[in-house]
């Protein structure tokens, strides 16, 4: 699904009073920057329209940023990502948005959330799945950046770990971490370990007793 964010060039920059008036009209000040632009652009967003899109996207969601000037003439249409969002400390409303505009033919580095698929066998057996990293940094061309990295944990047993090298990635995407870094593990609960140890000790005990009796008989 394509997400299109519409914005207008903002002529008033750096004037706090003007920015407050802007927010009072139901608008959100924003800025766009990055190697895909000759210079940063000061923008204004329609609050209602932006929030409809914002609740469905993440930092790694590709957006089509469409910018128009005061005469409603389109001056920019480019792939972009949300780089940063500032919130009001009291109301928690969006106060400002930063858009990152990458170069089309150069790889970029961006954090992508992990999405767990399936239920681990180890969890079915009583283990606890521990997610070490909820998101990972990836390198890819802007149009190849995935919204999420899906990881199937179905075959993960008790005590097993899933590392960066085990992840199946889309073509043209690489995780910018060490191959041996652990992403997910199924921890064996202490009670489960004790139970297994007790069973082993019990099964070995009769052999020790029998062996002792045989030695006494030989004497």
UniProtKB/Swiss-Prot annotation:
GO cellular component, one term: cytosolic large ribosomal subunit
UniProt keyword terms in alphabetical order: Ribonucleoprotein, Ribosomal protein, RNA-binding, rRNA-binding
GO BP field: translation
Record bears the keyword Cytoplasm: no
Molecular function as annotated in GO: 5S rRNA binding; structural constituent of ribosome
Presence of the UniProt keyword Signal in the record: no
Residues covered by region (Disordered): 195-219
Low complexity: bias regions: 197-206
Compositionally skewed regions (Basic and acidic residues) per UniProt: 207-219
Function of the molecule: This is one of the proteins that binds to the 5S RNA in the ribosome where it forms part of the central protuberance.
Subunit structure as annotated in this protein's UniProt entry: Part of the 50S ribosomal subunit; part of the 5S rRNA/L5/L18/L25 subcomplex. Contacts the 5S rRNA. Binds to the 5S rRNA independently of L5 and L18.
Similarity comment: Belongs to the bacterial ribosomal protein bL25 family. CTC subfamily.
Name of the protein in question: Large ribosomal subunit protein bL25
Protein source organism: Fervidobacterium nodosum (strain ATCC 35602 / DSM 5306 / Rt17-B1)
Source taxonomy: Bacteria, Thermotogati, Thermotogota, Thermotogae, Thermotogales
């Amino acid at each position: 699904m394509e997400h299109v964010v519409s914005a207008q060039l903002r002529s008033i920059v750096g004037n706090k009073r003007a920015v407050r008036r802007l927010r009072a009209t139901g608008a959100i000040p924003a800025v766009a920057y990055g190697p895909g632009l000759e210079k940063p652009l000061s923008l204004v967003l329609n609050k209602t329209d932006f929030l409809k899109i914002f609740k469905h996207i993440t930092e790694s969601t590709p957006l089509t940023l469409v910018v128009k000037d005061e005469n409603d003439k389109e001056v920019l249409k480019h792939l972009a990502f949300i780089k940063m969002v500032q919130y009001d400390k009291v109301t928690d409303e969006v106060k400002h948005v930063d858009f990152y505009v990458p170069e089309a033919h150069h790889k970029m580095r961006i954090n992508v959330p992990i999405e767990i698929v399936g239920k681990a066998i180890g969890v079915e057996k009583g283990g606890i799945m521990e997610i070490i990293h909820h998101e990972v940094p990836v390198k890819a061309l802007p149009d190849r950046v995935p919204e999420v990295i899906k990881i199937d944990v179905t075959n993960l047993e008790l005590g097993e770990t899933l590392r960066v090298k085990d992840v199946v990635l889309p073509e043209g995407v690489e995780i910018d971490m060490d191959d041996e870094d652990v992403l997910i593990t199924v921890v064996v609960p202490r009670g489960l370990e004790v139970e297994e140890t007790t069973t082993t000790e019990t099964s070995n005990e009769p052999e020790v007793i029998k062996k002792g009796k045989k030695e006494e008989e030989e004497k």
